Structures are given as C-alpha cells and as structure tokens.
C-alpha cells in the first residue's frame, strides 16, 4: 500500500511512495530543456545541441535524479501531513514488485523520534559544591605568577643579586647547565649525549637518578653514575636497560623571583600599578573559576540523574549522525594541533559510539524537559550571562557587540542558559547536599573527573 506508514518496530517505520511515470517524464523533459541551454558538446555551439543528443547523453541520469527528488518530496509531504517526526534521513530503495505499469515506486525506511518518559526527580541525589576564595588563595596565585616570571642569575654575582659566591653546590631550584654522555655496554646511544644542556633541579624534567647525581656538584666537577631506564620509558631502544652516564656541571644559576610591587602589578596589566587592585582582580578571576568549576560539576551530576530517571529508545540514525560530527571535531582538533593531513585522517566512527549515544540521549531528554516545563532561555537571561562574562574584559561593550554580532556565538550562550535552567529545575526537585571545599580540593576534584 502506498502512502501508508507501516510500523516495523519501536522506532522503525516504512512507507511505500508511488509516483506516476507521467510526472517523472514531464519533469525529466523540463530539466533536459534547461540543461540543453548550457550543455557543451564537441561540434556544437553552447545551447545549440539537439535535444535527442542531450537526452541520449544525460536522459538516464536526469530521470534517476527526478525519481529520487520526487520520492523525497512525497516523503516530506506524507510525514508532515501525518505529523510524523522523522529522526535522521530516510533510506530509499526502488520497489519493483506490486507496482503498476504507469508508476514508479520506492520503499522509504526511517526512524521516528521516541517518546521520552522522565521519572520522579525527587529521588535524585546531587551534591552542590561551594568554595570561598581566601587571602591565602590569592597569595598562592601570586606566588605562581611570580614563578612564571622567574629569571636566573649566575652564582657569584655581586651587588643586589649577590648569592654567596660561585663556589656553592647545585641545589634544588637552581638552573644548571651540564654536558653529559650516556653509554650502554660501553656504546653511546642516540639521545644519550648533549652539551650545554640546561634544566632546573627539582622540576622532575630529568629522571630522578640524573637529578640526584647533579645535586651537590660544583662548577667544573663531574660524576659518573648508573641510570636504569624505566620499562615504559618513551625511548623504546633504551627502555628497561641500564646506562652509565657521566655528567659535568658547567654553570649554576639561582632563581630570582620578582618582588610584589608596582612594577609587578603593571606586568599583570594593572595600569596604575596598584597592588590592591591586582589582588582584587586575582580574587575576581579565582571566583569566576570557582563558578565555572562548581557549575560544571553540578551540571554533570544533574545530567547523570536525568539519564538514570529517563526511559527512551534512541534512534540509530541520530547516533550515526552524531558519530560523524564527533569524527569531524576530532579531525579539526588534530588540524589545530598541527597534525599533517588531519582532514584526510581515517578515524573510525565506531570509537565514538558510546559518546554519541549518550549525547543524543541527553539531547532528547533535555528537549522534553524544556518543552514540558517552559525552561526555554529568555532574552533577558542570555543578556545577563553575556554581561557577566563581559565584565572580565577591558571593554565590556565590545564583548557584547562581539556576541550579538554572530548568531552562532549567541546560540552557544542560549544553550548555556538553557542548561542552567534545567540544572536549577532539577535541583529544586532533587535531594541536594551542600558541600564546602577549599579551592585546592575543588581543583583536584575537577581534574580527577576530567581524567
């Protein structure tokens, strides 16, 4: 039966589309006429190729295109008329059996969107984390910023950077410059030799045995020592083997951290060099980071709660579409990292199957909960979020214009606000436990979740 949608399973459907051959032939001829005005053939001027030759050359291809175009249009009309919500793209197959002589027919198989049932959210349990930024956290951040701006002085300098003389031994925190050579069974190996090689003792850049051997040396002194490469060492040719190294210390430099003063504040973008303004800006940035992390942690819990509380079948077509999106995202990421030929890199879509299913499932759940409870993002909510984000920039008005000047960026902020609305809605119904943690605990927990 044509035009009747058959139920093949939970989400699978099929409809037979019958199209009169006369309609196909009529549109085919119209397209061939249009094509004849531009087609080029040897021996004829453009637009002067006889219709018989145009039809002989292109007739079969044009008829094929017309058949599928008409099938697609008819499919759209039928599903729209019967209010069927199609998930993904239909698959068309030419139907040969049971077809009238004056028509062509296709079987279109497709999936529909599922019914989404969201259970009792009052049973959901989430933890809402909060963190207070203290003066100690501001001080720690300043220390990190100072270390990022560290510069080194050679041992033995006099004046304000005097350090007790050049005869001191290398200590943790010093930057040392060394020559070294390594041998395995008396033979040098690739990567085992260097001259004027600098590194900072205690940073862990070198293997522990190498750093330990360098500690305590004075300029000009050498030491020979055994070094066992770990079995999982990145250099496969030496992994699991023991080498004999000789290291010679050529220079020792001590770390000089900048003072926290007007010049330091100006280096961080504080125009008037106010240390108090610098501290206030650092506190504000830390509070913004706290808001971002705590919101992300809460959102993840809410999404998991929604997944557990909801029942639905997920259309395979939507999963496959999302897998392809994730593949393209992976290729773009590799391209941005400088990977050669990233655009053509073969990335199997199957590796994203679970991630895609989860994303699609959450998307369907969110759409249902937003629609059922009127949680759409309002214009004033979007504006408020953009204004809050813009505060961290020197020219907030320019940031506002940047957002409102691009529909894609605006859509991303709308999605963020919509997610916030869902998170707040679920938290109002769920069992929420408030938990205070230090900034250090917050960052450690957030990093653990990302890992």
Swiss-Prot record:
UniProt catalytic activity: [protein]-peptidylproline (omega=180) = [protein]-peptidylproline (omega=0)
Gene Ontology cellular component list: cytoplasm
Keywords per UniProt: Cell cycle, Cell division, Chaperone, Cytoplasm, Isomerase, Rotamase
Gene3D superfamilies linked: 3.10.50.40, Trigger factor ribosome-binding domain (3.30.70.1050), Trigger factor, C-terminal domain (1.10.3120.10)
EC number(s) given by UniProt: 5.2.1.8
Top-rank EC class of the record's enzyme: isomerase
Protein's UniProt keywords contain Nucleotide-binding: no
Location of the protein in the cell: Cytoplasm
Pfam family, one: Trigger_N
GO MF: peptidyl-prolyl cis-trans isomerase activity; protein folding chaperone; ribosome binding
Job of this protein: Involved in protein export. Acts as a chaperone by maintaining the newly synthesized protein in an open conformation. Functions as a peptidyl-prolyl cis-trans isomerase.
Domain characteristics, as noted in the entry: Consists of 3 domains; the N-terminus binds the ribosome, the middle domain has PPIase activity, while the C-terminus has intrinsic chaperone activity on its own.
Protein name: Trigger factor
């Amino acid at each position: 039966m044509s035009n009747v949608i058959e139920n093949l399973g939970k989400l699978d459907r099929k409809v037979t589309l019958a199209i009169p051959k006369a309609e196909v032939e009529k549109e085919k001829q119209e397209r061939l006429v249009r094509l004849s005005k531009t087609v080029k053939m040897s021996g004829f001027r453009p637009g002067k190729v006889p219709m018989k030759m145009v039809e002989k050359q292109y007739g079969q291809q044009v008829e094929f295109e017309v058949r599928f175009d008409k099938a697609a249009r008819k499919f759209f009309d039928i599903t729209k008329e019967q209010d069927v919500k199609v998930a993904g793209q239909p698959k068309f197959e030419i139907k040969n059996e049971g077809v009238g002589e004056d028509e062509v027919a296709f079987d279109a198989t497709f999936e529909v969107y599922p019914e989404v049932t969201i259970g009792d959210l009052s049973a959901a349990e989430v933890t809402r984390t909060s963190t207070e930024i203290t003066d100690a956290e501001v001080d720690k951040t300043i220390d990190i910023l100072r270390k990022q701006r560290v510069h080194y002085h050679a041992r033995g300098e006099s004046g304000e950077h005097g350090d007790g003389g050049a005869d001191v031994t290398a200590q943790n925190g010093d930057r040392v410059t060394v020559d070294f050579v390594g041998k395995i069974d008396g033979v040098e190996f690739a990567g085992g030799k260097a001259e004027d090689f600098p590194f900072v003792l205690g940073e862990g850049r070198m293997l522990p045995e190498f750093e330990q051997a360098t500690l305590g040396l004075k300029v000009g002194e050498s030491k020979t020592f055994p070094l066992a490469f770990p079995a999982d060492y990145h250099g496969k040719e030496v992994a699991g083997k023991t080498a004999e190294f000789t290291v010679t210390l050529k220079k020792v430099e001590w770390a000089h951290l900048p003072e926290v003063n007007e010049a330091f504040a100006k280096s961080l973008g504080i125009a008037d060099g106010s240390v108090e303004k610098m501290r206030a800006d650092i506190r504000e940035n830390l509070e913004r980071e706290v808001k971002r992390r705590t919101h992300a942690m809460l959102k993840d819990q809410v999404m998991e709660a929604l997944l557990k509380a909801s029942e639905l079948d997920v259309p395979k077509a939507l999963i496959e579409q999302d897998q392809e999106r994730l593949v393209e995202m992976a290729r773009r990421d590799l391209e941005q990292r400088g990977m050669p030929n990233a655009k053509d890199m073969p990335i199997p879509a199957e590796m994203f199957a679970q991630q895609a299913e989860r994303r699609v499932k959450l998307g369907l759940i969110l759409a249902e909960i937003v629609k059922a409870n009127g949680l759409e993002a309002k214009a004033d909510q979007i504006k408020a979020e953009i204004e809050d984000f813009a505060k961290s920039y020197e020219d907030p008005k320019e940031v506002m214009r940047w957002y409102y000047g691009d529909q894609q960026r605006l859509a991303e902020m709308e999605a963020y606000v919509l997610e916030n609305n869902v998170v707040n809605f679920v938290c109002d119904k769920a069992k929420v436990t408030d938990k205070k943690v230090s900034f250090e605990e917050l960052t450690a927990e957030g990093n653990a979740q990302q890992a």
